[in-house]
């Protein structure tokens, strides 16, 4: 809710000090763009830190190896493996 109140406050200031409607529109647009860029920078910093933590974790190696398996290539051989294991 804070960004909403900030934008509304800046809008009120813009209305009181603006010379024309076009100036108000331009000022609001600039403020909104600035807020969006700041939020994106913060989110990218958070994502970068999460990626580093995930890549540094050694216990995840097995899970990543399983995720990399091409299941479409392996799936046709699964019934044969199940039959072979079931016979023993």
UniProtKB/Swiss-Prot annotation:
This is Arminin 1c. Residues 1-18 form the signal peptide. It comes from Hydra vulgaris. It is found in: Secreted; Target cell membrane. Keywords: Amidation, Antibiotic, Antimicrobial, Immunity, Innate immunity, Membrane, Secreted, Signal, Target cell membrane, Target membrane. Residues 19-57 form a propeptide. Antimicrobial peptide with a broad-spectrum antimicrobial activity. Keeps its antibacterial activity under a wide range of salt concentrations that mimic physiological conditions of human blood, which is surprising, since Hydra is an obligate freshwater animal with nearly no salt tolerance. Does not affect red blood cells. Expressed in entodermal epithelium along the body column. The lineage of its organism: Eukaryota, Metazoa, Cnidaria, Hydrozoa, Hydroidolina. Belongs to the arminin family.
């Amino acid at each position: 809710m804070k960004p909403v109140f900030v934008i509304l406050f800046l809008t009120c200031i813009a209305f009181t000090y603006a010379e024309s409607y076009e100036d108000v529109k331009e000022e609001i647009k600039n403020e909104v763009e600035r807020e969006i860029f700041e939020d994106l920078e913060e989110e990218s910093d958070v994502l970068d830190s999460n990626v580093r933590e995930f890549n540094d974790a050694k216990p995840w190696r097995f899970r990543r190896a399983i995720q990399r398996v091409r299941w479409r290539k392996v799936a046709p051989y699964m019934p044969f493996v199940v039959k072979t294991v079931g016979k023993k």
